[in-house]
UniProtKB/Swiss-Prot annotation:
Keyword terms, alphabetized: NADP, Oxidoreductase, Porphyrin biosynthesis
GO biological-process terms attached to the record: protoporphyrinogen IX biosynthetic process from glutamate
Primary enzyme class: oxidoreductase
Note: During catalysis, the active site Cys acts as a nucleophile attacking the alpha-carbonyl group of tRNA-bound glutamate with the formation of a thioester intermediate between enzyme and glutamate, and the concomitant release of tRNA(Glu). The thioester intermediate is finally reduced by direct hydride transfer from NADPH, to form the product GSA.
Presence of the UniProt keyword NADP in the record: yes
EC assignment: 1.2.1.70
Record field: catalytic activity: (S)-4-amino-5-oxopentanoate + tRNA(Glu) + NADP(+) = L-glutamyl-tRNA(Glu) + NADPH + H(+)
Record-annotated site: Important for activity: 97
Source organism phylogeny: Bacteria, Pseudomonadati, Pseudomonadota, Gammaproteobacteria, Vibrionales
Protein name: Glutamyl-tRNA reductase
Pfam families from the UniProt entry: GlutR_dimer, GlutR_N, Shikimate_DH
Length: 419
């Protein structure tokens, strides 16, 4: 078992690079199949969100560069472009990183709970595609239990802070009151649902949900009293929106500069706030150059969320201590597995020797042998059989002048306790 975690996130890579290496739903099954059937990988999970793309896998020795090369080739991104933003964690560092991610300690918004759901979804998709092996299974199950422990023992998730919350906070900063604002939500996934929940608390005048799948949009709209439109109807409704918040899995922008320009003319250039929290981006970056259009991307939210992080930093110290403890414990368990086969083989060898000598003694006893003599003979032969290999190892280490090896063997045999 050799654990590896590689990836990029909002701290190391720009939105542009994160867009290039994002695994959309249409690519994920193929990627998991390629990864798990590679001769270098025993099992793996791919986590791809707006803020990070990460690969967690159980690899064969000296295979980390092969996984990095695969990521580069799969997305047709050169290693020269990828490597400066790439982080690589191995063994306990990989374990610790996944636990930190699952606990929200590595998120754009410290302690945000949504990432745990995303990690669980990534794990479920890997299982569905038969990409998970026993090592990654154990790793992710442990990460989930650690995240639960952190939520139980700390208050890191005590306040509603998330990218979705930050988007709503931005809207509140720009529009003093949302009571007169019409909000267009593009997408109907988990992030948009969180945005809708936050907005509902501010009683905005009207909420419109635009989504590719009408059924999902209707489900969301019914919760919050919103109207529903199709994505291709956005140009007809955009002028009515004071605030646009978008988060879809579309590989191409949904809202372009020309569309917004037309909407602003129809609005007589009343200001419009557009918040794009999708990766790849849903709104063309050129929209930000238009007068009266205020465009913010995921990266722009960083400055907003900073003010919400302070209250969680103290709790994060305790959470980090839990992660350090749990990652060390898991690493110790992993190391103990390396001895399992050896212990099993050693026990088998000792039992076979015992059974062989015992059977011979029982046969001799049945033939009328002296029980006392046979018992002494059995104990002597069993002792000699069991100490033969360790004795040879001690002799060889001494003859070859290897005091360190000799000391290890003595310690293993418990001889140091006799002095």
């Amino acid at each position: 078992m050799s654990l590896l975690a590689i990836g990029i996130n909002h701290n190391t890579a720009s939105v542009e690079l994160r867009e290039k290496v994002a695994f959309g739903p249409e690519k994920l099954s193929l990627a998991l199949n390629q990864l798990s059937t590679s001769s270098h990988v025993k099992g793996g999970v791919i986590l791809s969100t707006c803020n990070r793309t990460e690969i967690y896998c159980d690899v064969r020795s000296a295979s980390k560069n092969k996984v990095i090369e695969w990521l580069s080739q799969f997305h047709q991104v050169s290693l020269d472009e990828l490597k400066p933003s790439l982080y690589v964690h191995e063994e306990q560092a990989a374990i610790r990183h996944l636990m930190r991610v699952a606990c929200g300690l590595d998120s754009l918004v410290l302690g945000e709970p949504q990432i745990l759901g995303q990690v669980k979804q990534a794990y479920a998709e890997a299982r569905e595609n038969h990409a998970v092996n026993p090592a990654t299974e154990k790793l992710f199950q442990k990460a989930f239990s650690v995240a639960k422990r952190v939520r139980t023992e700390t208050e890191i998730g005590g306040s509603a802070v998330s990218v979705a919350y930050a988007a709503c906070t931005l809207a509140k900063h720009i529009f003093e009151s949302l009571a007169d604002a019409t909000v267009l939500l593009v997408g109907a996934g988990e992030t948009i649902e969180l945005v809708a929940k936050h907005l509902a608390g501010h009683h905005c005048k009207r909420m419109i949900v635009a989504n590719r799948t009408r059924e999902r949009a209707l489900s969301l709209a019914q919760q919050f009293g919103a109207d529903v439109i199709a994505l291709n109807e956005i140009p007809d409704y955009l002028a009515q929106a004071d605030i646009v918040i978008s988060s879809t899995a579309s590989p191409l922008p949904i809202i372009g500069k020309g569309m917004v320009e037309s909407a602003l003319k129809a609005r007589r250039h009343q200001p419009m706030l557009l918040v794009d929290i999708a990766v790849p981006r849903d709104i063309e970056p050129q929209v930000g150059k238009l007068n009266d259009a205020y465009l913010y991307s995921v990266d722009d939210l960083q400055s907003i969320v900073d003010s919400n992080i302070e209250q969680r930093k103290v709790e994060a110290i305790q959470a980090e201590a839990i992660v350090s403890e749990e990652s060390a414990t898991f690493m110790s368990w992993m190391r103990s597995l390396q001895a399992v086969d050896s212990i099993r083989d050693y026990r088998k060898q000792a039992n076979e020797a015992r059974e062989e000598l015992l059977n011979k003694s029982l046969q001799a006893l049945a033939a009328g042998g002296d029980p006392e003599k046979l018992l002494i003979e059995l104990s002597n032969k069993l002792t000699n059989k069991l100490i033969h290999t360790p004795t040879r190892a001690l002799q060889t280490a001494a003859e070859q002048g290897e005091p360190a090896k000799l000391a290890v063997i003595r310690q293993s045999l418990g001889l140091d306790d006799l002095n």
